[in-house]
């Protein structure tokens, strides 16, 4: 692994940290390639990945200086291809991804939040899409918020270039929780530890179902049948479900049983 992405192994979960603090963790080509390598190394290794940034920024998007240099050199200033790879690497990864949004998240940073399965932000985090100021549509973060937010809230981010705080992002449903900065990593890693207690196959199949059902299925019966198929795949992959019912019948609690958020 290089120096632009830092990885900490924590047992059943890992913390992957964007590590360009001098650039507010803007993602140049080299950082995107290292990030893809880090994601690949976590396949079949950890059940959960916490994604965060070094110092006071989560990710300020693409490296605009590199993009501008490319334009002057005649290189097409379009980082789309490897951003698509990053998008697919997270969404198709078997692990559950948790964004720990520790500060500024602009453009590509907002994309990373949308891509992750769960997200916790500092109350003061700043999330925004500056692309309209460059006469551009946010081609990755825009679709993400349009899927996850109401149309007016998505339009606010896309059309005004104004940033919202982590607290507002929680109220809008863009993140699950907003917490004081000092508590962010403690909360994110505690959540990672709780999620990592569950069966790996069940986590992966549930992740896939959470994405597939809203996007592909609009009829209740088909949705229920899809859910039945998901559980069949989990059962066929091992005996985790049988073990769970056996624990319950013997008077033991399964992870998550009998507790609220």
Predicted regions and their residues:
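C-terminal alpha-helix plus adjacent terminal tail
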Residues: 1-11, 42, 161, 165-166, ...
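Conserved CoA-thioester-binding segment of acyl-CoA-metabolizing enzymes
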Residues: 1-54
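Hydrophobic/aromatic residues within transmembrane alpha-helices
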Residues: 16, 51, 63, 112-114, ...
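Hydrophobic alpha-helical membrane-association signature
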Residues: 31-35, 79-82, 227
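Glycine- (often His-adjacent) and acidic-residue-rich active-site loop
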Residues: 45, 53-89, 105, 252
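A general structural signal for well-ordered alpha-helical segments in protein cores
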Residues: 64, 83, 142, 151-154, ...
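Crotonase-fold acyl-CoA enzyme core
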Residues: 88-201
């Amino acid at each position: 692994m290089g120096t632009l992405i830092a990885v900490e192994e924590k047992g059943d979960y890992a913390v992957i940290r964007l590590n360009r603090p001098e650039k507010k963790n803007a993602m140049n080509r080299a950082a995107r390639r290292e990030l893809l390598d880090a994601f690949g190394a976590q396949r079949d290794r950890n059940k959960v990945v916490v994604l965060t940034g070094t110092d006071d920024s989560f990710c300020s998007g693409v490296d605009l200086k590199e993009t501008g240099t490319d334009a002057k050199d005649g290189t097409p200033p379009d980082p789309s291809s490897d951003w698509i790879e990053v998008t697919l690497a997270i969404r198709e990864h078997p692990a559950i991804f948790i964004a720990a949004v520790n500060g500024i998240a602009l453009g590509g940073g907002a994309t990373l939040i949308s891509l992750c399965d769960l997200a916790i932000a500092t109350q003061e985090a700043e999330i925004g899409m500056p692309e309209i100021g460059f006469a551009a549509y946010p081609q990755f973060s825009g679709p993400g918020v349009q899927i996850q937010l109401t149309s007016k809230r998505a339009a606010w981010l896309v059309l005004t270039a104004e940033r919202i705080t982590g607290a507002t992002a929680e109220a809008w449903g863009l993140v699950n929780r907003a917490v004081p900065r000092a508590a962010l990593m403690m909360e994110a890693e505690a959540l990672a530890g709780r999620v990592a207690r569950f069966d790996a196959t069940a986590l992966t199949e549930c992740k896939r179902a959470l994405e597939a059902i809203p996007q592909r299925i609009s009829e209740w019966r088909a949705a229920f049948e899809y859910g039945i198929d998901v559980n069949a795949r989990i059962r066929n992959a091992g005996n985790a479900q049988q073990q769970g019912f056996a624990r319950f019948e013997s008077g033991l609690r399964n992870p998550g049983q009998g507790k609220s958020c």
